[in-house]
Amino acid sequence: METAQHQQNNQQHYLHQHLSIGQGTNIEDGSNKNNSSNFMCRQNSTRWTPTTDQIRILKDLYYNNGVRSPTAEQIQRISAKLRQYGKIEGKNVFYWFQNHKARERQKKRLIAAATTDNTNLPMQMQFQRGVWRSSADDPIHHKYTNPGVHCPSASSHGVLAVGQNGNHGYGALAMEKSFRDCSISPGSSMSHHHHQNFAWAGVDPYSSTTTYPFLEKTKHFENETLEADEEQQEEDQENYYYQRTTSAIETLPLFPMHEENISSFCNLKHQESSGGFYTEWYRADDNLAAARASLELSLNSFIGNSS
């Protein structure tokens, strides 16, 4: 009897355990199914696609009615009104107003920055590689011109300001230092007292002078002056040595005797210090001496020296 009761108790305990396990698994499976269905619903309900009517009402509230940061109560009323035109929640209304305010602030900053740049652009001077550059649309470059100045190409290694000085000088023309084809030709003068001068400034003293041959005019004139002085000295020395060497072998020129048209006479004298001869021409100042027109040659010293 005891063994039979013990077996029945074991069977009941076994059945109870299996039933409880089965119910637990069913409960767990049901909860998992419910969780998965809820997750799918959340994925489908997270994204909000507004309709044209909803966007129109929201913009009207934002721009025309001045609603920028609606309260919770206002959000509920707005969302309830917008549900008539499509699916919408309160959080969608809240985020729409937040995003719209952020975009508007960003747009205002960009517009302010662009306005500031456009205002300061005509007034600012750009410094680039040692060259001051003004606005290219400066009317002075188009209103007044510098005749005789032709500069087709330029670079940005230095600046040369060439302008007209005088009665008709207008402004200055900025030319760069590495001009390859830069020439200055004199313009036509308007009258005898109007003249044109060209001045240059801002030239690098250590730059090559072959680019600007006209800038070396002072040095060129100095060199010409020195060369002219040297040539004059050489000519004077050559003339001196030539006179010293030729004075000893000087021959007497042939002069016509008693010529009526001669108004002067020549006197040949002997120079004892050098051993040579030199001639002296005398022009008659009075009419009587000119009418006489006699040529006197004193050869006494020459005869005495030869004897």
Curated annotation (Swiss-Prot):
Protein localization: Nucleus
Domain of life: Eukaryota
A Gene Ontology cellular-component term: nucleus
Entry's Gene Ontology BP terms: cell differentiation; flower development; plant organ development
Signal peptide: none
Sequence segments annotated as region (Disordered): 23-44
PROSITE patterns: HOMEOBOX_2
DNA-binding interval(s): 43-108
GO-annotated molecular function: DNA binding; DNA-binding transcription factor activity
Tissue-specific expression: In the active shoot meristem, it is specifically expressed in a small cell group underneath the presume position of stem cells.
Keywords of the record: Developmental protein, Differentiation, DNA-binding, Flowering, Homeobox, Nucleus, Transcription, Transcription regulation
Function per UniProt: Transcription factor that plays a central role during developmental processes such as early embryogenesis and flowering, probably by regulating expression of specific genes. Required to specify stem cell identity in meristems, such as shoot apical meristem (SAM). Acts in parallel with HAM.
Family per record: Belongs to the WUS homeobox family.
Name of the molecule in the record: Protein WUSCHEL
Organism: Petunia hybrida
Gene: WUS
